[in-house]
């Protein structure tokens, strides 16, 4: 693929995720948008690693680390969301004022 096409696709994914993260009122949707942002960044890592130096896999290895961290973040985030839902019966961000207590 052409470098510009992949970068434009990655920018679109990043902007869609950022827009969803800013406008989302649901915690699960916000976590999904955060994952979309991380996947766009991973796409950039792999693209630049492939474009600038084919012999080394630094971007690919860093991408694997980001995927592992994103999986841990998703597991912890969903555990927190399920705990909030059990206690408050809602996953809306604006109704959850946990830091005031």
Curated annotation (Swiss-Prot):
Which Pfam families does the entry link to?
A: Oxidored_q2
Q: Which GO terms describe its biological process?
A: ATP synthesis coupled electron transport; photosynthesis, light reaction
Q: Where the protein is mainly located, per its record?
A: plastid
Keywords associated with the record = Chloroplast, Membrane, NAD, NADP, Plastid, Plastoquinone, Quinone, Thylakoid, Translocase, Transmembrane, Transmembrane helix, Transport
Where is the signal peptide, in residue numbers?
A: none
Task: Describe the reaction catalysed, as an equation.
Answer: a plastoquinone + NADH + (n+1) H(+)(in) = a plastoquinol + NAD(+) + n H(+)(out); a plastoquinone + NADPH + (n+1) H(+)(in) = a plastoquinol + NADP(+) + n H(+)(out)
Q: Name one GO molecular function term.
A: quinone binding
Lineage, top-rank taxon, reads Eukaryota
Xref: InterPro entries = NADH_UbQ_OxRdtase_chain4L/K, NUOK/Mnh_C1-like
Recorded topology in the membrane:
Multi-pass membrane protein
Question: Where does it live in the cell?
Answer: Plastid, Chloroplast thylakoid membrane
What is the enzyme's class at the highest EC level?
Answer: translocase
Q: Which GO terms describe its cellular component?
A: chloroplast thylakoid membrane; NADH dehydrogenase complex
User: What residue intervals traverse the membrane?
Assistant: 2-22, 32-52, 61-81
Q: What is its EC number?
A: 7.1.1.-
What the record says about family reads: Belongs to the complex I subunit 4L family.
Q: Which NCBIfam families match?
A: PRK05715.1-2
What PANTHER family is this protein classified in?
A: NADH-UBIQUINONE OXIDOREDUCTASE CHAIN 4L, NADH-UBIQUINONE OXIDOREDUCTASE SUBUNIT ND4L
* Quaternary state and interactors: NDH is composed of at least 16 different subunits, 5 of which are encoded in the nucleus.
Q: Which HAMAP family match?
A: NDH1_NuoK
The job of this chain, per UniProt, is described as: NDH shuttles electrons from NAD(P)H:plastoquinone, via FMN and iron-sulfur (Fe-S) centers, to quinones in the photosynthetic chain and possibly in a chloroplast respiratory chain. The immediate electron acceptor for the enzyme in this species is believed to be plastoquinone. Couples the redox reaction to proton translocation, and thus conserves the redox energy in a proton gradient.
This protein is called NAD(P)H-quinone oxidoreductase subunit 4L, chloroplastic
């Amino acid at each position: 693929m052409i470098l510009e096409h992949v970068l434009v696709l990655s920018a679109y994914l990043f902007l869609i995720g950022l827009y969803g993260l800013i406008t989302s009122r649901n915690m699960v949707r916000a976590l999904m948008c955060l994952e979309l942002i991380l996947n766009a960044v991973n796409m950039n890592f792999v693209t630049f690693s492939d474009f600038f130096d084919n012999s080394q896999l630094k971007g690919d290895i860093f991408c694997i680390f980001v995927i592992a961290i994103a999986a841990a973040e998703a597991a912890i985030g969903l555990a927190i969301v399920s705990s909030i839902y059990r206690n408050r019966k809602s996953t809306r961000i604006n109704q959850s004022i946990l830091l005031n207590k």
